[in-house]
């Protein structure tokens, strides 16, 4: 971490022993150990916070990309919907025109300029039809009274 060799640590220990003294050196060493532990935890916390921020930043970028994609899809869907609506309206208008034209043609055919000849009734067809064949009861031989 600090790139300190073993000999440098020995020199620092001897100087601390001379300056602080043998009675207070263990207490100072314990305090320095606690401070170094806190410093390491703080550094680790900062590292994890930085990692978390990087991950959150990546997630934000991903979220922004997804939002942008969703917006473009909505725009595309609206454009497609508008195109379909316009096509449907054009087809309806064309069908309405065709229906009007067909209605005019049918109404024009219903009212001809000359009236059609009257259709013969059922009684008229009987008078035109040939007489019915005689039934077997009618074909009895004549009796002798008819001489």
From Swiss-Prot:
Topology with respect to the bilayer: Single-pass membrane protein
Compartments where found: Cell inner membrane
Any GO BP annotation: protein transport by the Tat complex
Region (Disordered): 67-147
Keywords: Cell inner membrane, Cell membrane, Membrane, Protein transport, Translocation, Transmembrane, Transmembrane helix, Transport
Chain intervals with Low complexity compositional bias: 109-120, 129-147
InterPro entries to which the protein is assigned, alphabetical: TatA/B/E, TatB
Segments passing through the bilayer: 1-21
Molecular function via GO: protein transmembrane transporter activity
Main location: membrane
Pfam families: TatA_B_E
Basic and acidic residues bias: start-end ranges: 93-103
GO cellular component terms given for this protein: TAT protein transport complex
Entry's family note: Belongs to the TatB family.
PANTHER family assigned: SEC-INDEPENDENT PROTEIN TRANSLOCASE PROTEIN TATA, CHLOROPLASTIC
Cross-referenced NCBIfam families: tatB
Quaternary structure and interacting proteins, as annotated: The Tat system comprises two distinct complexes: a TatABC complex, containing multiple copies of TatA, TatB and TatC subunits, and a separate TatA complex, containing only TatA subunits. Substrates initially bind to the TatABC complex, which probably triggers association of the separate TatA complex to form the active translocon.
Purpose: Part of the twin-arginine translocation (Tat) system that transports large folded proteins containing a characteristic twin-arginine motif in their signal peptide across membranes. Together with TatC, TatB is part of a receptor directly interacting with Tat signal peptides. TatB may form an oligomeric binding site that transiently accommodates folded Tat precursor proteins before their translocation.
Protein name: Sec-independent protein translocase protein TatB
Organism expressing this protein natively: Bordetella pertussis (strain Tohama I / ATCC BAA-589 / NCTC 13251)
């Amino acid at each position: 971490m600090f790139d300190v060799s073993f000999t440098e640590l020995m020199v620092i220990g001897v100087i601390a022993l001379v300056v602080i003294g043998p009675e207070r050196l263990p207490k100072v060493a314990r305090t320095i150990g606690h401070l170094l532990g806190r410093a390491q935890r703080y550094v680790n916390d900062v590292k994890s916070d930085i990692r978390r921020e990087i991950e959150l930043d990546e997630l934000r970028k991903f979220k922004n990309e997804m939002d942008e994609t969703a917006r473009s899809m909505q725009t595309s869907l609206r454009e497609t919907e508008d195109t379909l609506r316009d096509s449907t309206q054009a087809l309806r208008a064309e069908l309405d025109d065709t229906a009007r034209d067909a209605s005019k043609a049918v109404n024009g055919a219903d009212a001809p300029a000359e009236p059609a000849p009257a259709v013969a009734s059922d009684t008229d067809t009987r008078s035109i039809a040939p007489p019915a064949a005689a039934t077997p009861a009618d074909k009895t031989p004549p009796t002798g009274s008819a001489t």
